[in-house]
A protein has these predicted regions:
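SMC-family hinge/dimerization module
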Residues: 113, 117-149, 158, 218-221
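Extended, Lys/Arg-enriched charged tracts that mediate electrostatic binding to polyanionic substrates
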Residues: 81-130, 200
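Glycine/charge-rich, flexible interdomain linkers and switch-proximal surface loops
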Residues: 105-120, 183, 187, 194, ...
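Extended, charged coiled-coil "arm/hinge" scaffolds of SMC/Rad50-like chromosome-maintenance ATPases
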Residues: 54-67, 156-177
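N-terminal accessory segments that target, anchor, or regulate ATP-driven/P-loop NTPase machines
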Residues: 95, 101-108, 113-115, 143-155, ...
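Intracellular alpha-helical coupling/juxtamembrane segments of multi-pass membrane proteins
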Residues: 83, 87-90, 168-175, 179-200
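Coiled-coil heptad-register positions
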Residues: 36, 98, 102-105, 172, ...
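Conserved amphipathic alpha-helical "coupling/scaffold" segments
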Residues: 1-79, 83, 186-189, 193-207, ...
Length: 221
């Protein structure tokens, strides 16, 4: 309910919140499909079920952008797909630059595993060697025997990745805003759907309880 109210107020929902809304919409669709498939008379419930409505536009938008894990997919927009392709290339460039540095400075390197400082790939080298390596120093290890260095050959690829990460965030925010707007446009109906589902769930739970105990409905005369 809070998620729907936030969308109604124009706030941008997170990808996991949008996935929750998608589950609600699909749940409503499932109830309506089940209602059409059963032949047993259920007039007492029909008035309730008839108030349910599927938010088709929001369902389509969310399903096209958010995967089952609550993540924005590459195919959410052509721009995002392109940015992520470029980001993967930047990561490959970083990996290649690291491998070249490790091969050329094997005697200076303490650990061949890439570490990240301030979201930038750096390499752990002997502190005694840090001033002989062209690049940026991000501090020393706890022991003081090694230093985190961003070699000059990594600065360009790291900058490129940071630029792409910023663009990726902007595009994701744009996509989330569009999906949230679609949810907001039908939020009032979906809040009503949620309340109806809660009532139906309560009624079915009571019916199941009575069935398990061979109960019968009282008749007032």
């Amino acid at each position: 309910r809070d998620t729907l109210k936030n969308a109604q107020k124009g706030r941008i929902l997170s990808a996991p919140e949008l996935l929750d809304v998608l589950h609600l919409i699909r749940g409503i669709r499932g109830i309506l499909q089940y209602d059409r498939s059963i032949s047993v008379p259920h007039d007492n419930l029909q008035d309730l079920i008839s108030t349910l409505s599927v938010s088709t536009e929001a369902e389509k938008k969310i399903a096209a952008c958010i995967n089952e894990y609550g993540e924005v997919t590459d195919n959410a927009s052509p721009a995002l797909r392109q940015i992520r392709m470029q980001k993967r290339q930047a990561e490959a460039d970083i990996s290649a630059a690291v491998n070249r540095f490790l091969a050329d400075h094997a005697a200076s390197v303490v650990d061949s595993i890439v570490t990240y400082r301030q979201d930038r790939a750096v390499i752990l080298v002997k502190s005694s060697e840090k001033n002989s390596i062209q690049g940026l120093v991000y501090g020393d290890s706890a022991s003081g025997q090694a230093s985190y260095v961003e070699p000059a050959s990594l600065i360009g690829p790291n900058n490129r990745k940071q630029e792409l990460l910023s663009k990726e965030k902007e595009e994701i925010d744009r996509i989330l805003a569009l999906c949230s707007a679609a949810v907001g446009s039908t939020a009032e109906q979906d809040i009503s759907n949620l309340e109806t589902c809660a009532l139906l769930d309560s009624l079915f739970a009571k019916a199941q309880w009575g069935k398990e105990r061979n109960g019968i409905a009282a008749s007032l005369t």
